[in-house]
């Protein structure tokens, strides 16, 4: 069975039709989705009201699952699977959390451009985010194409970036927002790792920028110079021409490739309920 995909952006991202993710996928469908991911890097599946079991089963088609920030979070989950990340403003009692609650404050970092789990090696490959409850307005998610962004860099800057590496740290994005209320154990739960600023995508052979809010500095450069370089690259990569904005409906599942896509949530009224669940697969690359 072929998988039908319609473009959502001139450079990347596609909507997938005529497939029911609640049912077990055959090997042909899995391979076709992987092929589309190599080409489009973001796939949108509408009308997929998945249970936790169904979301986990779908995600496991694409490799082992990873927990990412769970090691730092060190708090109970509302979900039956530790591998499901709670992207919501809902507390353990099922009510919308208070504005200053950890569930809310911690998730503000999701509104910075980032790649899931770039703070570990191996990092994440695919993330699959399922919309359970969406607010009346706002709360969209944006994605930017880091392969196209690299291609559009001046050749001299491309050459300058070769061989440079950035340090990524799990709490860097939180610290940027003044969210520093973490114990020593939490701060040390995931030591920093470093990644090349430019990597090659295994599925397409294309080069891409690997940066984002987890990247704290560039190794071998003065801190200020390195941070300005990271800021310049991020400003370039997140121009409108490289960005797809997804407006959520209940039952949407969006799947993206963390290696060559950055994403961020957008602002919404945090007194309105917003519930999304994310499953993420582990990559096999250590560079």
Swiss-Prot record:
The modification 3-hydroxytryptophan is found at residue 113. The gene is tfdA. Hydroxylated on Trp-113; inactivates the enzyme. Changing residue 114 to A: Loss of activity. It comes from Cupriavidus pinatubonensis (strain JMP 134 / LMG 1197). This is Alpha-ketoglutarate-dependent 2,4-dichlorophenoxyacetate dioxygenase. Activated by ascorbate. Pfam families: TauD. Changing residue 9 to A: No change in activity and substrate affinity. The keyword tRNA processing does not apply.
């Amino acid at each position: 069975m072929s998988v039908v995909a319609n473009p959502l952006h001139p450079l990347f991202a596609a909507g997938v039709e005529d497939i029911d993710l609640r049912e077990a996928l055959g090997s042909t469908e899995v391979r076709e989705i992987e092929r589309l991911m190599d080409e489009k890097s973001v796939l949108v599946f509408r009308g997929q009201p998945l249970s936790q079991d169904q979301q986990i089963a779908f995600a496991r088609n694409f490799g082992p699952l990873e927990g990412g920030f769970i090691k730092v979070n060190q708090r109970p989950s509302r979900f039956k699977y530790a591998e499901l990340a709670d992207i919501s403003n809902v507390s353990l009692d099922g009510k919308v959390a208070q504005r200053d609650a950890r569930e809310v404050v911690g998730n503000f970092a999701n509104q910075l451009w980032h790649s899931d789990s770039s703070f570990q090696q191996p990092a994440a490959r695919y993330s699959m985010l399922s919309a359970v409850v969406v607010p009346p307005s706002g709360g969209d998610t944006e994605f930017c194409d880091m392969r196209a962004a690299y291609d559009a860099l001046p050749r001299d800057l491309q050459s300058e970036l070769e061989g440079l590496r950035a340090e990524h740290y799990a709490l860097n994005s939180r610290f940027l927002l003044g969210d520093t209320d973490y114990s020593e154990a939490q701060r040390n739960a995931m030591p920093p790792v470093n990644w090349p600023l430019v990597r090659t995508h295994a599925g397409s052979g294309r080069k891409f920028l690997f940066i984002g809010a987890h990247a704290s500095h560039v190794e071998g450069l003065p801190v200020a110079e390195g941070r300005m370089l990271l800021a310049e690259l991020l400003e370039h990569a997140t121009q409108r021409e490289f960005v797809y904005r997804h407006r959520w409906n209940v039952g949407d599942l969006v799947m993206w490739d963390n290696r060559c896509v950055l994403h961020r949530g957008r602002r919404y009224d945090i007194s309105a309920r917003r519930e999304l669940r994310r499953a993420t697969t582990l990559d096999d690359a250590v560079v």
